[in-house]
UniProtKB/Swiss-Prot annotation:
PANTHER family: ALANINE RACEMASE (PTHR30511), ALANINE RACEMASE, CATABOLIC-RELATED (PTHR30511:SF0). Substrate binds at R136, M315. GO terms for cellular component: cytosol. Catalyzes the interconversion of L-alanine and D-alanine. May also act on other amino acids. Keywords: Isomerase, Pyridoxal phosphate. It catalyses: L-alanine = D-alanine. The keyword Isomerase applies. Its cofactor is pyridoxal 5'-phosphate. Belongs to the alanine racemase family. This is Alanine racemase. Pathway: Amino-acid biosynthesis; D-alanine biosynthesis; D-alanine from L-alanine: step 1/1.
Length: 387
């Protein structure tokens, strides 16, 4: 498709992204929409999709590590950016230099932030993480933690911007544990209010909670997977939110040949032809994020029809049986590995089911060896070739 690229690419539909963002904004109906763009925006290319998010309702961004935030700042992104995870003390200067907000879950760490901020004549903006039942980072919701956060609020050069927690089961039909977590969160907030600790923005709503738990929408929400067109599970109420997948993974046929019956395909002799077969080679493999765990399960879309991947997926190539595909398939034919054409689809949900994992992992797996091609109004507006 693209003369200057290898014949494997991920198409990123910015119109679908904009549509998802608009629907999320409408459903959330709150002040702060913190778009989750960690892991390079779940594999979609953070620098290239953030402008679309901001244009359509995102007011802030969240990343997992400080380097992701720095990349956005260097790319000209000026809106608030917070780090959801831990930033080592050795990288605090980087946080402050680029005006990136930091998650805090201990008094000692806050003191280090305060010292560094004083030294640099900066104000460290922070979000207090509360562990309401995830067992991950965060203050436990008890009296000692309330006193610690009060002490943090009094440190020089520290500004508490928000307080947040994370649901562990909001994407499940049974919301009992989510109700427990919400209660813990609310009690902790009331404890801070009692101590006159000012919290500007409470945010606990993840993708599933935005859809199913309107009572968790406070001053802010944190949409993640739903930005990219996928539901967090099959147990959420999908009627609440219309989503369109943003990414398609495509390639081209690079070789076709007839293989006699009784011949082996790929490593390990795990697949043997039981008839004369027409085999197409695709220049995509597990180094691109098309995992070899799909052996014996994967299908691709070619000429609007499904064709099975045969033999083990190699690091850089895989083979497809196109014997039963109608039409004259030639070298250069477009193949869809993740996506849809003429009502035939293989999406990240389908692949996740084959692998026994979640759609998040499938789209995050697409490696930076795969160029990202950005589509708007049906036209290519940008290509990001990482290598």
């Amino acid at each position: 498709m693209f003369k200057h690229l290898r014949p494997v690419w991920a198409e990123i539909n910015l119109d679908n992204l904009a549509s998802n963002m608009k629907h999320i904004k409408e459903l959330s109906n709150t002040k702060e929409i913190i778009g989750i763009v960690k892991a390079d925006a779940y594999g979609h290319g953070a620098l290239d999709i953030v402008p679309t998010l901001i244009e359509n309702g995102a007011t802030a961004l969240a990343v997992a590590v400080v380097s992701e935030g720095v990349e956005l700042r260097r790319g000209g992104i000026e809106c608030p950016i917070m780090v959801l995870g831990f930033t080592p003390p050795s990288l605090i200067d980087m946080l402050l230099k680029h005006d990136i907000e930091q998650t805090v879950f201990s008094l000692d760490y806050a003191k280090e932030l305060s010292k560094a901020a004083e030294k640099m004549h900066k104000v460290a903006k922070i979000h207090i993480a509360v562990d309401t039942g995830m067992g991950r980072i965060g203050f436990l919701p008890n009296e000692q933690s309330i006193q610690d956060v009060k002490a943090i609020s009094m440190l020089p050069n520290i500004k508490i911007k928000g307080m947040f927690s994370h649901f562990s089961t909001a994407d499940e039909k049974n919301k009992e544990y989510s109700a427990y977590q919400l209660n813990q969160f609310n009690k902790f907030y009331e404890g801070l209010k009692r101590e006159n600790v000012n919290i500007e923005t409470r945010h606990i709503s993840n993708s599933a909670a935005i859809m199913d738990l309107p009572e968790t929408i406070f001053e802010g929400v944190r949409p993640g997977i739903i930005l990219y067109g996928y539901y967090p599970s099959n147990e959420v109420d999908k009627t609440k939110l219309e989503l369109k997948p943003v990414m398609q993974l495509k390639t081209n046929v690079v070789h076709i040949k007839k293989i006699p019956s009784g011949e082996y395909i790929s490593y390990g002799r795990k697949f043997k032809t039981d008839r004369e077969s027409l085999i197409a080679t695709l220049p995509v493999g597990y180094a691109d994020g098309y995992t070899r765990l799909l052996f014996g399960k994967a299908k691709v879309i070619i000429n609007g029809q499904l064709a099975p991947v045969v033999g083990r997926i190699c690091m850089d190539q895989c083979m497809v049986d196109i014997t039963d595909i109608k039409g004259d398939i030639k070298v250069g034919e477009e193949v869809i590995l993740i996506g849809e054409k003429n009502g035939v689809k293989i999406d990240a949900d389908d692949i996740a089911e084959m692998l026994g994992t979640i759609n998040y992992e499938v789209i995050c797996m697409i490696s930076k060896r795969v160029p990202r091609v950005y589509i708007k109004n049906g036209e290519v507006i940008k290509v990001r070739n990482y290598i």
